[in-house]
Amino acid sequence: MSKENKTTDFGFTQVPWEEKQKKVAGVFHSVAAKYDLMNDLMSFGIHRIWKKQTIAKSGVHKGDNVLDLAGGTGDLAYKFCQMVGQQGKVILSDINSSMLEVGKEKLTNKGCVGNIEYVQANAECLPFPDNYFDCITISFGLRNVTDKDKALASMCRVLKPGGRLLVLEFSKPIIPLLSKVYDEYSFKALPFLGKIITQDAESYKYLAESIRKHPDQQTLKQMMYDAGFDNVEYQNMTGGIVALHIGYKY
């Protein structure tokens, strides 16, 4: 079946393959200005701990080239700028221009200049040379990608041999009681918060649905192997609400 006739998930809705990217873009154009505030409210600030653990496992050193993919408002990119120093380079990349503008303004105001570039790009066809980056991170972005397999293969292509990919993403809770509570919170509280803070309940309804449609821990692990990564492992956080997958290129 050609992509023109294929459908894919947009939350719980099936949409034509080529329309998902436009719909996801609409979501993030809508929420970009309040994205950081909503992250703090939705996760009770815990997203900062998840990201801190991701940075700690990145293995980034001075002089490295780092790609923060789907980097949005730049939480990870800011830390990486400090870690690589002026000898290194960080590229903050996002497919969404609104998110990228918020990230650029935020990091510039924090004094992050000289060793960072901002690139609007699609994860499925990254505009970077082969074997270029020492480390790639994608934080809460992979589930929004239409062709995840193609995106993972693209990441593997631009990663240097010896480099690592870190995928921080919502996943499947491993504790049954937590799963029930999490479902109630996701489908009721998140759209309510979205309506109050951003006047956009539908975007946060999509967020809850997109999490449920994202591959579970073991499935994503195998997808990373299939894309060319080795020694893939994952760490559950907060009972599996979030998982950090790490894969290496040799």
UniProtKB/Swiss-Prot annotation:
Disulfide bonds: none annotated. Keywords: Menaquinone biosynthesis, Methyltransferase, S-adenosyl-L-methionine, Transferase, Ubiquinone biosynthesis. It is an enzyme of class 2 (transferase). Its EC number is 2.1.1.163, 2.1.1.201. GO terms for molecular function: 2-methoxy-6-polyprenyl-1,4-benzoquinol methyltransferase activity; demethylmenaquinone methyltransferase activity. It catalyses: a 2-demethylmenaquinol + S-adenosyl-L-methionine = a menaquinol + S-adenosyl-L-homocysteine + H(+); a 2-methoxy-6-(all-trans-polyprenyl)benzene-1,4-diol + S-adenosyl-L-methionine = a 5-methoxy-2-methyl-3-(all-trans-polyprenyl)benzene-1,4-diol + S-adenosyl-L-homocysteine + H(+). It holds the Pfam family Ubie_methyltran. Pathway: Quinol/quinone metabolism; menaquinone biosynthesis; menaquinol from 1,4-dihydroxy-2-naphthoate: step 2/2; Cofactor biosynthesis; ubiquinone biosynthesis. InterPro entries: SAM-dependent_MTases_sf, UbiE/COQ5_MeTrFase, UbiE/COQ5_MeTrFase_CS. S-adenosyl-L-methionine binds at T73, D94, N122, A123, S139. It comes from the Bacteria. Methyltransferase required for the conversion of demethylmenaquinol (DMKH2) to menaquinol (MKH2) and the conversion of 2-polyprenyl-6-methoxy-1,4-benzoquinol (DDMQH2) to 2-polyprenyl-3-methyl-6-methoxy-1,4-benzoquinol (DMQH2). Belongs to the class I-like SAM-binding methyltransferase superfamily. MenG/UbiE family. This is Ubiquinone/menaquinone biosynthesis C-methyltransferase UbiE.
